[in-house]
């Protein structure tokens, strides 16, 4: 779903940060990413991690869905909608993640997580799963990035 409709106001999430999930399923968002306090954010269950997306990603997906036929459009919107929830960053800079989804991706209360900047969105990984996945993802990303550097 390539989309070039990015502006100076489009959020940019960079770097990796480590943090802990508290007893209320909240994780502190890194200070450089807190501009998103003013933005609508959505959390999406992505198999082995959670993705936190700005509204622009949701709108991009909706434009893609609009290109599909009736039943395909309904199916893809249902699949997306059932794995996505709206979230907010509170005044203390914390994001509450859905407990059931957190547990599905290996995140428990008081456990360590890795927040991974992915430019257009950020990911929340259980620390141990991120360590397992990181080498493969980093190698693939480095190979693809070499085409642009």
What is each stretch, according to the model?
Residues 1-24, 32-87, 91-92, 99-149:
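Flexible "stalk/tail and boundary" regions
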């Amino acid at each position: 779903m390539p989309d070039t409709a990015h502006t100076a106001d489009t959020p940019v999430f960079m770097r990796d940060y480590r943090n802990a999930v508290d007893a209320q399923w909240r994780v502190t968002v890194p200070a450089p990413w807190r501009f998103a306090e003013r933005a609508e954010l959505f959390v999406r269950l992505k198999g082995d991690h959670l993705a936190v997306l700005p509204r622009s990603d949701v709108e991009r997906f909706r434009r893609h869905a609009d290109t599909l036929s009736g039943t395909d459009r309904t199916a893809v919107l249902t699949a997306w909608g059932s794995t996505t929830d709206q979230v907010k960053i509170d005044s203390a800079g914390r994001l509450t993640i859905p407990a059931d989804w957190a547990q599905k991706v290996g995140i428990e209360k008081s456990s360590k997580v890795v927040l991974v900047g992915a430019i257009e969105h950020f990911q929340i990984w259980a620390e141990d799963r991120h360590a397992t996945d990181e080498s493969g993802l980093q190698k693939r990303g480095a190979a693809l990035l070499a085409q642009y550097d």
